[in-house]
């Protein structure tokens, strides 16, 4: 019993640290590219999102769920892929991790507190994006992301087997082992989705990443637009994979 409790605590702590590392990487890239006024600022951020995601998943997946995204975890809870209380614990750990990432960035930032938070806080782009544009951008980006995460890691296809371990469907073949390639696939998805949101929402598709700088700056404009799109999109992507696009067996 004590060992199980310790494993749970380790897993929760691991999820918090994973969220911290990912958040610190992304926030640092956003701030650094903005301060340096690099012409490749969007590319820098997109590559950081993708590569840091790959590294975090590979290094933390043995001790925790390595979601570092509350939209994935909520979708997993509502599709019964994870226990409710455990899932809520992971979500809390994720939010704390992102808050700590903002705190760490503030200590490292060479510019003042307000400017740092204004720079990393998500908001509509300067191209005239409306609240509706932002909502649907975050909805579709998060739906795509969560669907891919479910298909490769949370709910990958597993053929039915009998008591002897043989396939129930004689025509069934051993499925592709995605354990090695899933982090790479998810990280690359993070990267290309970050580029897809450039015209409207900026491409956050992560409630934790969105919430932390808003909470630290006490600036809540567009908060519900972002979180509403992200959580609804995540649930849609998860349900689509579980109920509609999970491979059907022929038995």
UniProtKB/Swiss-Prot annotation:
A GO cellular component term found in this entry reads: plasma membrane
Which segment of this protein is annotated as the motif NPA?
Answer: 69-71
Segments in the Cytoplasmic topological domain: 1-11, 64-86, 155-179, 246-251
Keywords, A to Z, come to: Cell membrane, Membrane, Repeat, Transmembrane, Transmembrane helix, Transport
Instruction: From the Swiss-Prot or TrEMBL record, state where the protein is found.
Output: Cell membrane
Report the domain of life of the source organism.
Answer: Eukaryota
Q: Which family does it belong to?
A: Belongs to the MIP/aquaporin (TC 1.A.8) family.
**Name of the molecule in the record:** Aquaporin
Q: Which organism is it from?
A: Encephalitozoon intestinalis
- Name the lineage: Eukaryota, Fungi, Fungi incertae sedis, Microsporidia, Unikaryonidae
């Amino acid at each position: 019993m004590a060992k199980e409790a310790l494993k749970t605590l380790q897993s929760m702590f691991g999820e918090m640290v994973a969220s911290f590392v990912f958040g610190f990487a992304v926030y640092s890239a956003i701030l650094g590219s903005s301060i340096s006024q690099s012409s490749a600022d969007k590319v820098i951020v997109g590559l950081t999102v993708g590569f840091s995601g790959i590294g975090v998943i590979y290094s933390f997946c043995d001790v925790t769920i390595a979601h570092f995204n509350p939209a994935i975890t909520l979708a997993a809870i509502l599709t019964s892929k994870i226990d409710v209380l455990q899932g809520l614990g992971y979500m809390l750990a994720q939010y704390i991790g992102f808050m700590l990432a903002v705190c760490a960035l503030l200590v490292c930032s060479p510019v003042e507190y307000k400017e740092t938070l204004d720079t990393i806080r998500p908001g509509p782009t300067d191209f005239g994006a409306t609240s509706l544009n932002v909502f649907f951008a975050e909805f579709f980006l998060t739906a795509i992301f969560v669907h891919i995460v479910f298909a490769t890691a949370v709910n990958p296809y597993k053929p039915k087997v009998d008591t002897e371990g043989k396939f129930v469907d004689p025509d069934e073949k051993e499925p592709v082992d995605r354990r090695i390639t899933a982090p790479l696939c998810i990280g690359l998805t993070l990267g290309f989705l970050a580029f897809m949101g450039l015209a409207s929402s900026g491409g956050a598709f992560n409630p934790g990443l969105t919430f932390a700088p808003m909470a630290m700056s006490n600036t809540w404009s567009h908060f519900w637009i972002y979180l509403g799109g992200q959580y609804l999109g995540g649930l849609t992507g998860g349900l689509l994979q579980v109920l509609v696009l999970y491979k059907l067996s022929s038995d």
